[in-house]
């Protein structure tokens, strides 16, 4: 299957092996939850928390250890962000590109890139509103430059 905004094809990748907790993990459930909470309170985004748990603590997946995903742990502890991380990153990218286009109005390639980022954001907002992650009254124009 092809990628969305390019002519390149997708790349096949390895699949995660889900199942029981691996035998090499030395941490209890409480220690893993405390580590997640401490990392989030220190300002680390959820995707980086997963990478740190994998690389520094030897925990391949939070779901295998705790039985629930990282986002669920954060929402139970009241540490979930108002805007999902992927949408927030797209908003930052859009604002940076929009600022660049204001300074360089003849840069047609980045104008197109800005439009593609906006299209992706609109699709994500529609999905998050449909699934209940974002409130129906949430508006994208409030967070854009």
From Swiss-Prot:
UniProt-listed Gene3D superfamilies: 4.10.860.130, S15/NS1, RNA-binding (1.10.287.10)
The subunit structure is: Part of the 30S ribosomal subunit.
| CDD domains tied to this protein | Ribosomal_S15p_S13e (cd00353)
Q: Could you identify this protein by its name?
A: Small ribosomal subunit protein uS15
Q: Name one GO cellular component term.
A: cytosolic small ribosomal subunit
Q: Which domain of life is it from?
A: Archaea
Q: Does the keyword Ribosomal protein apply?
A: yes
Q: Name one GO biological process term.
A: translation
Which HAMAP family does the record cross-reference, listed alphabetically?
Ribosomal_uS15_A
Q: Which gene encodes it?
A: rps15
Q: Which UniProt keywords apply?
A: Ribonucleoprotein, Ribosomal protein
Q: Name one Pfam family in it.
A: Ribosomal_S15
